[in-house]
């Protein structure tokens, strides 16, 4: 019996495998170490670095950060209300860029609900109206004939519906209908790990709508869409046990754990995913705060859908900062990484020498400092992402894809990925 088979046997016990999705009895030490990685991020309180997902993840986990949690929520409220509710200024051309995205607003609403707050009052109503307007604008971009696309993504569209749903705020049937149609008729929604994230978020939005019955006329379509979403995510499971890849697995499990459609296939798939996640925790795979915040609820058998009725009195273990071991002085080792740019003319190819352990972002900065390479990034909750390379800005429905040879898209962001010696990194402008 292989290692994975043996672990599945231990996890499943001597009886038959369950037909529901449960992620229980995960090593508490591994979970604590995961939570400890979020603590330094809770000291970063600038508008650019505040991340509502961190607060949501902790509140739905078995861990707590004590007084730091309350201070973090207070900082979120100040930042989001001031930036989103202030009047638009003609004097500041970057005013719109400084405001949180609608996806971030949706996460902020989830954070409020994670503290057992219902959004309300004049300020709260204005935020709800902003999110509803965003959904209406996206609905118009998709079009009456469904031939268009959201200006942002179906992920943010789904997240917006979910955030309003947990606050018992109804959106129009036509808004829900656009997401239903996408799941029913757009197979490209599930082609890679990003699409697993999108499908899982859409499924959680549908789950909330099903449980809350906010759109009763759409109930039958919602039920069928949830069945379709579950089937597609289960089919996306890799031989290693991940849904899409390791980083898309937490959101997929959040959806599957709340499934009202039990089956042996579901139970087996979740046991396999749990075994894979256990291995990833032991290898310290999760370092990005957004990914950690999506995983922590899973390890406590919770999901964003539980924010319909959160349990704010549940006991949670207090996190203590990890003890840091002073780094030993070492002679730095250098590695060589080949950097290529394709999809534009002229192309670019250059070898960069950097200290071992450098992030891809560090490598790009080094190439910029010592040659003609130029790049720009934009901050996001998952870290910086490329917006411009060699002066070429990604246009509408374009993005700069990052790959490593042989033609493998990176699963991590440029701030998290650390290339190895001799590796080739390609930046490719692609459409979507």
Swiss-Prot record:
First-listed, main subcellular location of the protein, grouped into a coarse class: secreted
* Location within or outside the cell: Secreted
Cellular compartments per GO CC: extracellular space
Question: Which species expresses this protein natively?
Answer: Bos taurus
Q: Which family does it belong to?
A: Belongs to the eukaryotic cobalamin transport proteins family.
MF-aspect GO terms: cobalamin binding; metal ion binding
- Highest taxon of the lineage: Eukaryota
Glycan-carrying positions:
94
Q: Which GO terms describe its biological process?
A: cobalamin transport; cobalt ion transport
> Where is the secretion signal located?
1-18
All disulfide bonds of the chain are 21-270, 116-312, 165-208
Does Transcription show up as a keyword for this record?
no
Query: Which keywords, in A-to-Z order, does the entry hold?
Result: Cobalt, Cobalt transport, Disulfide bond, Glycoprotein, Ion transport, Metal-binding, Secreted, Signal, Transport
Functionally, this protein is described as follows:
Primary vitamin B12-binding and transport protein. Delivers cobalamin to cells.
Question: Assembly and partners?
Answer: Interacts with CD320 (via LDL-receptor class A domains).
- InterPro entries tied to this protein: Cbl-bd_prot, Cobalamin_Transport
The residues that the entry says bind cob(II)alamin are 104, 152-156, 193-197, 245, 248, 294, 400-402
Task: State whether keyword Transcription regulation applies.
Answer: no
Task: Report where it is expressed, by tissue.
Answer: Expressed in mammary gland, kidney, lymphatic nodes and liver.
The name under which this protein is listed is Transcobalamin-2
